[in-house]
Amino acid sequence: MTSFREFAPAKINLTLEVAGRRDDGFHEIRSLVAFARAGDVVTLEPGAARALTVSGPFADKLSGPNILSRALELLASTEAGLPTGSVHLEKNLPVAAGIGGGSADAGALLRVLRRASGEAGNAVDWHRFALTLGADVPVCLESRALWMTGVGEHLADIPDGLPVLHAVLVNPLADVPADKTARVFRALAAPRLAAHYGAPPAPRFADRDGLLAFMRVCGNDLAPAAEAVVPEIGAVLAALTSLPQIEYAALSGAGPTCFGVFPSAEAAAAAEAALAAAWPTWWVAASDIG
């Protein structure tokens, strides 16, 4: 039987602003999200016994319940007519890294299941199902540059598209608490969301300089709280900003992965080599983001 394969690219929050905390405890955000060329790979073998296997450089970092197993179980219980099967995950991205690794994997799994389902998949509300798995899963299901608001459920296209950025992704591979993201949001102490709040529309960028200017203004509201939880973030940002030709450096999501933007793919590759030599225990990957 034919197998189905999907790439699960790293999700990068080019900007992340927290609008406030809702009465239900969730935080409303606005974030410009794009995707890198680095990522995991999800393969589905339809018809085989339902199972999940994992390989890759970060396979041993996955422990406890896995979002892919949960997705398969939920689909089997709510959409009995859809095919499932054996799933293999090639885990190339660091875990709990702020680049949506688990969410990207879940989004890729839903895409392969949608492809394998044929016409039966047309009856499934994949966006709604993605949201039940996590706030970042809907944008990772789409796996393209989008403007994300609400808790992650509202997605809008970027008018005229997003200029490509030449970047380096860096993760210090520090010990990260299992409740990292919850700790970061607790430490943020965001104000209560105003009753009249309405998310702004998706931004428009005339060129790459306009995009970088927008990123510098918006930044990442989680960065100070995230660095308090994982202090190594400070060292990563310092290493990035010390590099020749660096144009911008920031934290993605709740971290600890950071990214630096460079004027060309060649400059990004040189930065990757320099960082890998200076910090051999870090995960470093040059990648276009778009």
Label every model-predicted segment.
Residues M1-A97, R115-V124, N171, P177:
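ATP-binding N-lobe of GHMP and related small-molecule kinases
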Residues G101-G102, L251-P256:
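Glycine-rich beta-strand-to-loop/alpha-helix junction loops that act as flexible
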Residues E142, W147-Y248, P263-E266, A273-A276, ...:
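Conserved, helical-rich catalytic subdomain that frames metal- and/or nucleotide-binding sites
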Residues S77-H88, R111-L133, S264-A277:
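Phosphate-handling active-site elements
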Residues A48-K61, L109, L131, G210-G219, ...:
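Short, basic/glycine-rich phosphate-binding loops at helix/coil junctions
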Residues F259-V261:
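Short hydrophobic/aromatic beta-strand micro-patches
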Residues A97-A123, V139-L141:
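DPxDG-like acidic metal-binding loop motif
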